[in-house]
From Swiss-Prot:
Secreted found in the keyword field: no
Keywords from the named record: Ammonia transport, Cell membrane, Membrane, Transmembrane, Transmembrane helix, Transport
Pfam families the record matches: Ammonium_transp (PF00909)
Transmembrane segments: 8-27, 39-57, 90-106, 114-137, 153-170, 189-208, 218-237, 246-263, 269-287, 301-319, 338-363
Keyword Chaperone: no
Annotated SUPFAM superfamilies: Ammonium transporter (SSF111352)
Cytoplasmic side: 28-38, 107-113, 171-188, 238-245, 288-300, 364-391
GO-annotated cellular components: plasma membrane
PANTHER family linked: AMMONIUM TRANSPORTER MEP2
Disulfide bonds: none
Residues under site feature: Twin-His motif. Important for optimum substrate conductance: 157, 305
Gene that produces this protein: amt1
Chief location of this protein within or outside the cell: membrane
Annotated organism of origin: Archaeoglobus fulgidus (strain ATCC 49558 / DSM 4304 / JCM 9628 / NBRC 100126 / VC-16)
Record's protein name: Ammonium transporter Amt1
C-alpha cells in the first residue's frame, strides 16, 4: 500500500471515529434534558466496548480464517499476527463496529440500565455484527454468493436498524409515551450531531475503497449527492405538511447517507440521485408508520438506518454501473446481482431482528434491561451517572 493510501485510510479511520460522538449528539438533542448525558455517554461506551472486544476476538471472528462461510476463526485473537497494513484495516473496521453499536442505542433511549446495555452490546457484536461482517466482507457465504455491500448497508445499517426495532419491542415504551408528546430538548445539539455524521461519512464511504483512488472519489461524491437529495425530499414534505423543520431535514439527509452506504462504490451520480430520492420517501413513510403504530423506537434507527440500508442494498442490484467499479446491476444487463442482493437483504434483515430479539429477551430475563420507574422519572443522567447536562 502506498504512503498516500495509508494516509487516506488513517484519515478515514479518524473520520469514522468522529461519527461515534456524532451519533451521541444527534440522539442527545432528541431526548429530554434529563437524559442528554446518558445518550452521549452510551456512544462513548459503545466505542470502549467495541475497542476491547475487537482486539480480543471481534476482528478475528469477523475477518479470520473462514469457517464454513459462517464465521471467522480465532487465528487473529488478541491481534496475533496482525501487522502493518492489516493493523490499519483492523482499526478502520473497529470504528465501523463502534458506530453500529452507537446507532443501536436509539432503541433504549431514556429507559435502559447502562450495565444491561454493556452486556447486550457485547453479545450483539459477537452474535450479530461479527457474523454479518464475515458474511459480506470476510469471505463468508454472502460474499461467495456475489452479494455486494460497499461500506455497510447490511453490515451496519440493516443490522443496527432492525436490531433497534427488536430491542425497542422488548424493553417497552417510555413512561408517558402514549399520554403526551415527548419533545426534543435541544435541536441545535442534534444538528451538531448531524454535521459530524455527514462529515464523518466521507471517511465511512470514501475510505471503504481502501485506497486514494477514483472509486474513493466517486464514493465521496455520490455520498454527498444522496444526502442532499434525501434531505431535500424531507424538506419538501415538511413544506407540504406545514413548515420544513430542521430536525426533519437532517433526518432526511441521514437517511440518504444510510441508503448510499452499500452503493457508494458501485453507482454513479445519477444512481445516487435515485437512491437519495427513494430513500427520502421510504424512510419518511417508515417513520410515519412507526408513529402510527405507536412503536417507541423514537430516535428512528429502524426507519432511517434499517429501511435506508435495506433500500440502498437492493438498489445496488439495480443501479450498479460497471464504469464505476466493474460491477453491473439489472439496468446494465446483470439481473443476477439483484437476485444476490435480495437474498442477502432478506437474510440479514431476518437474522438481525430475530437474533437480537432473542438476545434482548435473554438479557432482560437475566438482569433486566430497564431502569426502575423512579429512576426513569428522575432521568438517567442522575440515576445512571450522577451527573446533569445543564446547571
Amino acid at each position: 500500500m502506498s504512503d498516500g493510501n495509508v494516509a487516506w485510510i488513517l484519515a478515514s479511520t479518524a473520520l469514522v471515529m468522529l461519527m461515534v460522538p456524532g451519533v451521541g449528539f444527534f440522539y442527545a438533542g432528541m431526548v429530554r434534558r434529563k437524559n442528554a448525558v446518558n445518550m452521549i455517554a452510551l456512544s462513548f461506551i459503545s466505542l470502549i466496548i467495541t475497542v476491547l472486544l475487537w482486539i480480543f476476538y471481534g476482528y478475528s471472528v469477523s475477518f479470520g480464517n473462514d469457517i464454513s462461510g459462517i464465521i471467522g476463526g480465532l487465528n487473529y485473537a488478541l491481534l496475533s499476527g496482525v501487522k502493518g497494513e492489516d493493523l490499519l484495516f483492523m482499526m478502520y473496521q473497529m470504528m465501523f463496529a463502534a458506530v453500529t453499536i452507537a446507532i443501536l442505542t436509539s432503541a433504549i433511549a431514556e429507559r435502559a440500565k447502562v450495565s444491561s446495555f454493556i452486556l447486550l452490546s457485547a453479545l450483539w457484536l459477537t452474535f450479530v455484527y461479527a457474523p454479518f461482517a464475515h458474511w459480506l466482507w470476510g469471505g463468508g457465504w454472502l460474499a461467495k454468493l456475489g452479494a455486494l455491500d460497499f461500506a455497510g448497508g447490511m453490515v451496519v445499517h440493516i443490522s443496527s436498524g432492525f436490531a433497534a426495532l427488536a430491542v425497542a419491542m422488548t424493553i417497552g415504551k417510555r413512561a408517558g409515551f402514549e399520554e403526551y408528546s415527548i419533545e426534543p430538548h435541544s435541536i441545535p445539539l442534534t444538528l451538531i450531531g448531524a454535521a459530524l455524521l455527514w462529515f464523518g461519512w466521507f471517511g465511512f464511504n470514501g475510505g471503504s475503497a481502501l485506497a486514494a483512488n477514483d472509486v474513493a472519489i466517486n464514493a465521496v461524491v455520490v455520498t454527498n449527492t444522496s444526502a442532499a437529495v434525501a434531505g431535500f425530499v424531507w424538506m419538501v414534505i415538511g413544506w407540504i405538511k406545514g413548515k420544513p423543520g430542521s430536525l426533519g431535514i437532517v433526518s432526511g439527509a441521514i437517511a440518504g447517507l444510510a441508503a448510499i452506504t452499500p452503493a457508494a462504490g458501485f453507482v454513479d451520480v445519477k444512481g445516487a440521485i435515485v437512491i437519495g430520492l427513494v430513500a427520502g420517501i421510504v424512510c419518511y413513510l417508515a417513520m410515519d408508520f412507526r408513529i402510527k403504530k405507536k412503536i417507541d423506537e423514537s430516535l428512528d434507527a429502524w426507519a432511517i438506518h434499517g429501511i435506508g440500508g435495506l433500500w440502498g442494498s437492493v438498489a445496488v442490484g439495480i443501479l450498479a454501473n460497471p464504469e464505476v467499479n466493474g460491477y453491473a446491476g439489472l439496468l446494465f444487463g446483470n439481473p443476477q446481482l439483484l437476485v444476490s442482493q435480495l437474498i442477502a437483504v432478506a437474510s440479514t434483515t431476518a437474522y438481525a431482528f430475530l437474533v437480537t430479539l432473542i438476545l434482548a429477551k435473554a438479557v432482560d430475563a437475566a438482569v433486566g434491561l430497564r431502569v426502575s420507574s423512579q429512576e426513569e422519572y428522575v432521568g438517567l443522567d442522575l440515576s445512571q451517572h450522577e451527573e446533569v447536562a445543564y446547571t
